[in-house]
């Protein structure tokens, strides 16, 4: 499969303005933090972000003007940090369009993309306002004539995922919960992996069952020790609570958010403490 290694800047330079990007991880865990920071530094514009449950990644990209649309089931920090202030301001002001989902409808859309079908049935939407809010349609089950809601295929242009280990051919190993990363890799047109370490491919050949993301799906792999930060990355580090608390406080107002971004991201490459 060849050597797919690239620098972080090279890999993110292949992401065009207006792309639909699926970001791996979930809330504050194993998100592609280094890649998100590089997207900010490269001043991408007009992006659509796809994620079941986003937090710092979506919040920061909204604060920096990178995002036009967010398709997600949830955006917020949970834990002690509360809501995502920059995301909320961007949506309330009309700068960002929130395409509301349930986490299950994001997953169903990705599965439709994987299977090459235009839509996927989803149970459990009856009685909610989500179909009306999003225009999800109901169709007749051909076997029972019961009405079932379906969601359209959700095809990311690029999936950006952080893994604990990868080899130069792009095979990626995830330790712990995989979240929706495997679905994103299978559904996307292109895949970029960032990895805590690049290891000898022989280790993957000896235990192929440990490969979560096969190299034939991957277009670029980046050596990025600490590349999930400020998200957690089991078993290497937890999420950076002091940094996240500082960001959430700064993100409450556009001026303080700009100052934070200028001092912590644009003029430096953050690394885990």
Region spans (language model):
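Conserved alpha/beta enzyme-core scaffold
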Residues: 1-273
């Amino acid at each position: 499969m060849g050597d797919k290694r690239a620098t972080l800047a090279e890999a993110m330079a292949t992401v065009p303005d207006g792309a639909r990007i699926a970001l791996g991880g979930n809330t504050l865990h194993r998100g592609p933090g280094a890649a998100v920071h590089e997207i900010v530094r490269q001043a991408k514009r007009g992006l659509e972000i796809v994620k079941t449950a986003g937090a710092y990644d979506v919040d920061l990209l909204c604060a920096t003007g990178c995002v036009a649309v967010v398709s997600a089931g949830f955006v917020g920090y949970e834990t002690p940090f509360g809501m995502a202030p920059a995301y909320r301001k961007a949506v309330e002001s009309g700068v960002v369009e929130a395409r509301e989902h349930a986490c299950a409808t994001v997953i169903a859309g990705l599965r439709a993309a994987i299977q090459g079908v235009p839509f996927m049935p989803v149970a459990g939407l009856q009685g909610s306002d989500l179909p009306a809010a999003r225009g999800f349609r109901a169709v007749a089950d051909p076997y029972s004539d019961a009405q079932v809601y379906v969601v359209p295929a959700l095809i990311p242009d690029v999936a950006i995922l952080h893994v604990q280990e990868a080899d130069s051919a792009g095979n990626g190993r995830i330790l712990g919960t995989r979240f929706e990363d495997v679905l994103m890799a299978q559904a996307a047109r292109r895949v970029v992996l960032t990895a805590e370490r690049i290891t000898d491919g022989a280790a993957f050949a000896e235990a192929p069952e440990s490969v979560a993301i096969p190299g034939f799906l991957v277009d670029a792999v980046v050596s990025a020790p600490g590349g999930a930060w400020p998200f957690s990355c089991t078993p290497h580090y937890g999420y950076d609570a002091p940094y996240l608390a500082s960001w959430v406080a700064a993100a409450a107002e556009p001026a303080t958010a700009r100052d934070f971004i200028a001092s912590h991201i644009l003029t430096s490459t953050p690394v885990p403490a």
